[in-house]
């Protein structure tokens, strides 16, 4: 049985410009005492074709964690567009919110992300070099994919 139960994740600042931070408002319940900190991280998938294009946007340790309801806001920088293949900058990708205990991932929340131009003219005729200031990021927060993994807690 998991000692931590994710109860809610709200994504603020959505939709937003590509260069805006991701802001996750995370609520979880600690149902049994844990001795170590929780590690939370956000990973942006830069290309479905190559895992080396994935970017860890940020990682934090949270603790000590009290038994009961807990909540915090996790704000992370946007991905570095220079590390994303030009052909993968627009369209659908994924961002993961992951929580680990003692180095073992026990929950992963995946969200589809659609990056597209604000303006119809740019959608119809995208520039040769992507203009990040005109790209909108829309996290599909109504349909997260939540995966739990069994781990050794203590």
UniProtKB/Swiss-Prot annotation:
It comes from the Eukaryota. GO terms for cellular component: chromatin; nucleus. One of its GO terms (biological process) is DNA replication-dependent chromatin assembly. It is found in: Nucleus. The keyword Methyltransferase does not apply. Keywords: Chaperone, Chromatin regulator, Nucleus, Transcription, Transcription regulation. InterPro entries: ASF1-like, ASF1-like_sf. It holds the Pfam family ASF1_hist_chap. GO terms for molecular function: histone binding. Belongs to the ASF1 family. Histone chaperone that facilitates histone deposition and histone exchange and removal during nucleosome assembly and disassembly. Cooperates with chromatin assembly factor 1 (CAF-1) to promote replication-dependent chromatin assembly. This is Histone chaperone asf1. The lineage of its organism: Eukaryota, Amoebozoa, Evosea, Eumycetozoa, Dictyostelia.
């Amino acid at each position: 049985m998991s000692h931590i139960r994710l109860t809610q994740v709200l994504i603020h600042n959505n939709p937003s410009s590509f260069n805006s931070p991701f802001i996750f408002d995370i609520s979880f319940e600690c149902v049994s005492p844990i001795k170590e900190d929780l590690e939370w991280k956000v990973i942006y998938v830069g290309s479905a074709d190559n895992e080396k294009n994935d970017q860890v946007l940020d990682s934090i340790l949270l603790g000590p964690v009290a038994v009961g309801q807990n909540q915090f806001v996790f704000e992370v920088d946007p991905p570095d567009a220079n590390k994303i293949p030009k052909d993968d900058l627009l369209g659908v990708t994924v961002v993961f919110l992951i929580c680990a205990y003692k180095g073992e991932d026990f929950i992963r929340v995946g969200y589809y992300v659609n990056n597209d131009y604000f303006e119809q003219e740019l959608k119809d005729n995208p520039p040769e070099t992507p203009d990040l200031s005109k790209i909108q990021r829309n996290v599909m927060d109504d349909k997260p994919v939540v995966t739990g993994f069994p781990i050794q807690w203590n």
